[in-house]
Amino acid sequence: MKFVLLFGVLLVTLFSYSSAEMFDDFDQADEDELLSLIEKEEARAKECTPRFYDCSHDRHSCCRSELFKDVCTCFYPEGGDNEVCTCQQPKHLKYMEKAAGKAKKFGGKIKKWFG
């Protein structure tokens, strides 16, 4: 009976040690993958198209504003047959950003009064 108990404890110890190493390997792989994704995102972020610039070459390349990403909007100018695409911020998102900015200011004042 003592032998079975000792053997069981040994098995549990070995199993926990091997699973801990396995989890460490997974954590390292996840960390490496996350770092590579962050590097790709930073490289892609440098190539964004500013607001009111031509985005016809890549319609998903518009830069972000404070809260939202600008949208590539295409239109035909008066008297022209060529389509023109520029990065623009939709009005409803512009108003939402203004409201969020005012709410942030108001929250700071309340914190100052009661904090």
From Swiss-Prot:
Cysteine disulfide links: C48-C63, C55-C72, C62-C87, C74-C85
Primary localization: secreted
Keywords: Disulfide bond, Knottin, Secreted, Signal, Toxin
Classification via InterPro entries: Spider_toxin_CSTX_knottin, Spider_toxin_CSTX_Knottin_CS
Keyword Disulfide bond tagged: yes
Keyword Protease: no
Domain of life: Eukaryota
GO cellular component: extracellular region
Signal peptide residues on this chain, from the entry's feature table: 1-20
Compartment(s) of residence: Secreted
Pfam families: Toxin_35
GO molecular function: toxin activity
Propeptide: 21-44
Expression tissues: Expressed by the venom gland.
Family: Belongs to the neurotoxin 19 (CSTX) family. 01 subfamily.
Entry domain remark: The presence of a 'disulfide through disulfide knot' structurally defines this protein as a knottin.
Name of the protein in question: U3-lycotoxin-Ls1k
